[in-house]
Amino acid sequence: MKGKRVIAGILLVGILATALAGCKNTNITKKEREKPVITLGSDSYPPYNYLNEDGIPTGIDVELATEAFRRMGYQVDVVQINWEKKKELVESGEIDCIMGCFSMEGRLDDYRWAGPYIASRQVVAVNESSDIYKLSDLEGKNLAVQSTTKPEGIFLNRTDERIPKLGNLISLGHRELIYTFLGKGYVDAVAAHEESIVQYMKDYDASFRILEDPLMVVGIGVAFAKEDDRGICEQMDQTLEEMRQ
């Protein structure tokens, strides 16, 4: 398991090093402002995308996208979207792409993808006093997920023989709500990206325990509409590859 965590870190470190280096110069010139704009849709999902104290989008994905699109000759406008309507928004052209710790697995036929640019573990977390230690211990329990996320599909479809039948699967519209439900004892467990759970615990001084066995290790990418033939996705994919080297 430690090996998989190391791999995820390696994928991220190389890209972030170049992204952060590229973001050191924060002076926006007139030439920069004249660049065409890419509208990137995401919801609040720390540490990947969130608003800082000044209300400005920041996070791993924001820094990465800003640097990648800068290299491609674009400036980025990060907008908060209803995550449940992401596919509709990108297909209508209201946003150009989706980026928010977005898992590629199971969605390869739904979008045109750039990436993966990072690997992430989908995991289950419980309260520290819980008697749940293995995935099989979730049998008959109540579990909360953010709606339309990969964990929701994992527990709905149960194509993995390790996934037990739950008592109830509760899908909530916002990331923060699943942790509130867990903390108050409304559910027995939550499932999400490991980094998101760890970040929530840091931000809110919460104490959850993450199960050792992951639900899945997934590749994270940038999603464009399936019919988007502008070539931006392919250029983005190439740029991300160059940033990894």
Spans of features found by a protein language model:
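Extracytoplasmic small-molecule ligand-binding "clamshell" domains
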Residues: 30-102, 171
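Bacterial N-terminal signal peptides that target proteins for export
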Residues: 1-10
